[in-house]
């Protein structure tokens, strides 16, 4: 792999590294404090979760879901009211909220997939509808969540008695195990390719990449070990990302989303039910928006009528910044993870240095514009635009 190809392939990873170093310097190292690195995950958990669902929508042809922020508000409002005013066990409350999220997705998926209402219009209507319902349920008030079981399911930390004291060694041990598994998986994958006679990249470059990833994992888990340990919220985020990475890269159904975005007419002629693809994309998106609503409600400890405002923009921005094409048909879960982290680092870095909130919007808008321009220019060069 020559330098030009390397830079093109890892543009956003390089950008993430540069931005992280820049803010580490501008904040005089405060960005690297264990608490700030832990908050980086907690404050962007909802973005990572929703971005996985948004990716499926974007893959179908650059479509988006504008209603997810309002879905977060509606689901959070119902969870808060059920926990505050009924004797339902938190697990039942969670199941009710996730079921409601699926119903919302089925509602939107039907209109988009079967009736062929443009996704932008349908989800714009949903944005107003679900926001209004959420505010009506809350009665224009802020409802607090004090149920410890609910909070522990989403917003607690993993601590092992007898092992974790001032330093949460379990967090660093998890980092070591993950790093070892990545190395073992790399050896296994290369051995399988060699056995089948497949062409593969140079061993030095592949193991250098794994070494960098492992170093980052060990650094991050070491920092977590010196704060409160691994947040339970991280388990939810990792689970969602792994599931969607598997669906989009290892299953035939996952490839249908790419096919629809690449050429919908050809996909339909090949026998694939494109209506079902749209239906599943928006049902999946609403389910993850509902989960994000529960995560956000637990982290903040309360819900109000403005909960979830602009969340859809963060999810959409993460996808485009992470390499998802504005035309659809391309994008990966690892890419959107990089995009979400990059956006999170920018947000947290600007907050730490005390940049005015108005200028924070300017910076985020500029970053998104640059990412989309890069995508459009790249597609024109390869003849994919239009």
Model-identified regions with their sequence ranges:
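Transmembrane helix-bundle core of multi-pass membrane transporters
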Residues: 130-248, 383-386
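Alpha-helical transmembrane segments within multi-pass membrane transporters and channels
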Residues: 87-128, 338, 343
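Inter-helical junctions in multi-pass inner-membrane proteins, predominant
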Residues: 29-39, 221-234, 245-249, 254, ...
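Loop-to-transmembrane alpha-helix initiation sites
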Residues: 43, 119, 148, 165-175, ...
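Membrane-helix/interface signature in polytopic inner-membrane proteins
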Residues: 186-200, 242-282
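Transmembrane alpha-helical segments in multi-pass inner-membrane proteins
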Residues: 282-295, 299-362
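Single transmembrane alpha-helix segments in multi-pass membrane proteins
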Residues: 23-25, 30-86, 110-117, 266, ...
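Cytosolic-side transmembrane-helix boundaries in multi-pass membrane proteins
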Residues: 1-21, 142, 179-211, 273-276, ...
């Amino acid at each position: 792999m020559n330098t030009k190809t390397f830079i093109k392939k890892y543009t956003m990873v390089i950008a993430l590294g540069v931005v992280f170093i820049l803010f580490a310097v501008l904040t005089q190292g405060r960005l690297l404090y264990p608490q700030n690195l832990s908050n980086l995950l907690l404050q962007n958990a909802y973005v990572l979760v929703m971005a996985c669902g948004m990716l499926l929508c974007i893959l179908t042809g650059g479509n988006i879901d504008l209603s997810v922020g309002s879905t977060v508000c509606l689901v959070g409002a119902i969870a808060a009211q059920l926990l505050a005013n009924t004797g339902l066990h938190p697990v039942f409350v969670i199941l009710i909220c996730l079921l409601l999220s699926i119903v919302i997705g089925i509602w939107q998926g039907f209109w988009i997939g079967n009736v062929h209402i443009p996704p932008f219009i349908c989800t714009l209507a949903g944005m107003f509808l679900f926001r209004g319902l959420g505010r009506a349920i809350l009665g224009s008030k802020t409802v607090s969540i004090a149920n410890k079981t609910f909070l522990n399911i989403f917003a607690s930390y993993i601590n092992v008695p007898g092992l974790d004291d001032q330093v949460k060694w379990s967090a660093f041990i998890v980092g070591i195990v993950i790093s070892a598994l990545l190395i073992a998986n790399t050896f296994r994958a290369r051995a399988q390719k060699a056995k089948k006679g497949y062409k593969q990249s140079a061993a030095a470059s592949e193991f250098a990449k794994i070494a960098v990833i492992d170093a980052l994992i060990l650094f991050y888990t070491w920092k977590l070990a010196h704060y409160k340990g691994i947040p339970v919220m991280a388990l939810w985020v990792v689970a969602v990302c792994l599931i969607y990475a598997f669906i989009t890269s290892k299953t035939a159904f996952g490839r249908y989303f790419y096919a629809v975005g690449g050429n919908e007419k050809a996909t339909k002629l090949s026998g694939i039910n494109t209506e079902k693809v749209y239906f599943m994309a928006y049902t999946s998106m609403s389910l993850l928006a509902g989960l994000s609503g529960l995560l956000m409600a637990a982290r903040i400890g309360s819900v109000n009528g403005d909960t979830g405002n602009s969340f859809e923009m963060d999810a959409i921005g993460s996808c485009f910044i992470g390499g998802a094409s504005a035309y659809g048909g391309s994008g990966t879960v690892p890419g959107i993870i990089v995009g979400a982290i990059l956006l999170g680092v920018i947000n947290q870095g600007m907050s730490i240095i005390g940049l005015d909130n108005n200028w924070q919007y300017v910076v985020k808008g500029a970053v998104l514009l640059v990412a989309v321009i890069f995508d459009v220019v790249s597609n024109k060069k390869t003849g994919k635009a239009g």
